[in-house]
Amino acid sequence: MVDVSQHELVPEHTVLDEETLDGVLADYDIDRTELPKIKYKDPALPDNAEIGDVVEIVRDSRTTDEAVVYRLVIE
């Protein structure tokens, strides 16, 4: 079986710890439920991602060096 999360075109996905997440939510002045969603079964998610976690995705960008986005893991 192929592990798509290791493919060179799949951006880095990292599960945030609660302290980091609190800082991100405070910076954007939003609640966890207001974040864009990502399905639990998405093959790009790390193995330790669980429903309710927030994942930081760092990807290449044409306009900046990198773009950082956040997604809430849902069922």
Curated annotation (Swiss-Prot):
One of its GO terms (molecular function) is DNA-directed RNA polymerase activity. SUPFAM superfamilies: RPB5-like RNA polymerase subunit. The keyword Nucleotide-binding does not apply. GO terms for biological process: DNA-templated transcription. It comes from the Archaea. Its EC number is 2.7.7.6. It catalyses: RNA(n) + a ribonucleoside 5'-triphosphate = RNA(n+1) + diphosphate. It is found in: Cytoplasm. It holds the Pfam family RNA_pol_Rpb5_C. Keywords: Cytoplasm, DNA-directed RNA polymerase, Nucleotidyltransferase, Transcription, Transferase. GO terms for cellular component: cytoplasm; DNA-directed RNA polymerase complex. It is an enzyme of class 2 (transferase). Belongs to the archaeal Rpo5/eukaryotic RPB5 RNA polymerase subunit family. DNA-dependent RNA polymerase (RNAP) catalyzes the transcription of DNA into RNA using the four ribonucleoside triphosphates as substrates. Part of the RNA polymerase complex. This is DNA-directed RNA polymerase subunit Rpo5. It comes from Halobacterium salinarum (strain ATCC 700922 / JCM 11081 / NRC-1) (Halobacterium halobium). The lineage of its organism: Archaea, Methanobacteriati, Methanobacteriota, Stenosarchaea group, Halobacteria. The gene is rpo5.
